[in-house]
Amino acid sequence: MELAEAVRDETAMAMRLLGHLARAPRGGGGDKNLAVSPLSLHAALALLGAGARGETLDQIIAFLGPAGGPAHAALASHVALCSLADDSGPGDDRGGPKVRFANGVWVDAALRLKAAYARVVADKYRAEARPVSFRDKLEEARREINEWFESATAGRIKDFLPKDAVDRATPAVLGNALYFKGDWESKFDARSTSDDVFYLPDGGHVSAPFMSSGKWQYIACRAGYKVLRLPYARGGRGRGRDTGRLFSMYIYLPDERHGLPDMLRKLCSDPAALIESSAALTEKVPVGAFMVPRFTLSYKTNAAETLRQLGLRLPFEYPGADLSEMVESSPEAEKIVVSAVYHESFVEVNEEGTEAAAATAVVMTLGCAAPSAPVHVVDFVADHPFMFLIKEDLTGVVVFAGQVTNPSSST
């Protein structure tokens, strides 16, 4: 029960993030392609929460949602150990999605993680803790962290932390990386892909390659929009057991060409409707016109200001932040605050399936001055801006969320 409540909170957080970024005049905006991983951010905040206490911990929990601290810790642990655990290996040919989910902690060699924190992040979140020397070997430490992210995302996210992301006063960095590559349960025939018009938010249009199919599809019609579910192949049994997870992409297509902002506002204000609309997509319906664009997009941001604007302030403030459960007591430990939250996502959708990757890094510093029912035949022509989600359907967690406003652009 507590897991289901935490999943509802994670879905609501996904929509808050996407809605906020879509409205932002800088670093995104309603006329830009967007892709974020709410699950990656959730995992990084769980690592941060494990080292927080007092009002700082309370604010992190409140940001994650009303299910509460134990529920969100349980969700983060379940995702790391079960739902997105990397259980592939040599000779593993089950055919399901390839999934990697990794947590990491890098602490300056002059400091020491508290034993309780190290134990929790290792046992509950499968986080690898590594000492690095930010003070004496800064560039080597940054390179080591970036190589970890590149490896964990199968090379899709490179040079993640910029040169100015860490300095000699950096005490620690917390990280999450995830990678997903899955084939569609029912692949598109590339011979049926053809260029057509995609209508842009500014009233213009571009030519884009559209995938099409005459097969029945999982589509539901709601007030003002339609939802398409494209399941990924689950694969068979491996090593004597089932994969225990099921992934799908959901495309939310507004009825009106310029209806994406209104649809986003509606779904952000009622995330329960989002959950219900996806849960109801269990029956296929015959389709008339059916077109979905191929697209590749990437998005990178320092999410610190977004998190502040959404109510998570204390971890960034000195005095105020209490992250004293992370490292052993010292004058430096009492001054640790979050200086930046770097986040990057990559999503590619084509006839075969989807490849996606995400990285989140919480960088610390030492504090000083603060910073409706379906019809019998349904048309689904995604020739104008739409929203998408990639979810793990058995838990319901939102792994990726984004909007496509121009499939011919990668940003």
UniProtKB/Swiss-Prot annotation:
Residue ranges, annotated region (RCL)? 353-377
Gene Ontology, cellular component aspect: extracellular space
Which top-rank group of organisms is this from?
Answer: Eukaryota
| Alphabetized UniProt keyword annotations | Protease inhibitor, Serine protease inhibitor
Per the record, where is site Reactive bond? G367, C368
Is the GTP-binding keyword given for this protein?
Answer: no
Q: Which GO terms describe its molecular function?
A: serine-type endopeptidase inhibitor activity
Main role? Answer: Probable serine protease inhibitor.
Family of the protein in this entry: Belongs to the serpin family.
Q: What is known of its domains?
A: The reactive center loop (RCL) extends out from the body of the protein and directs binding to the target protease. The protease cleaves the serpin at the reactive site within the RCL, establishing a covalent linkage between the carboxyl group of the serpin reactive site and the serine hydroxyl of the protease. The resulting inactive serpin-protease complex is highly stable.
State the protein's name. Answer: Serpin-Z1
Source organism of this protein record? Oryza sativa subsp. japonica
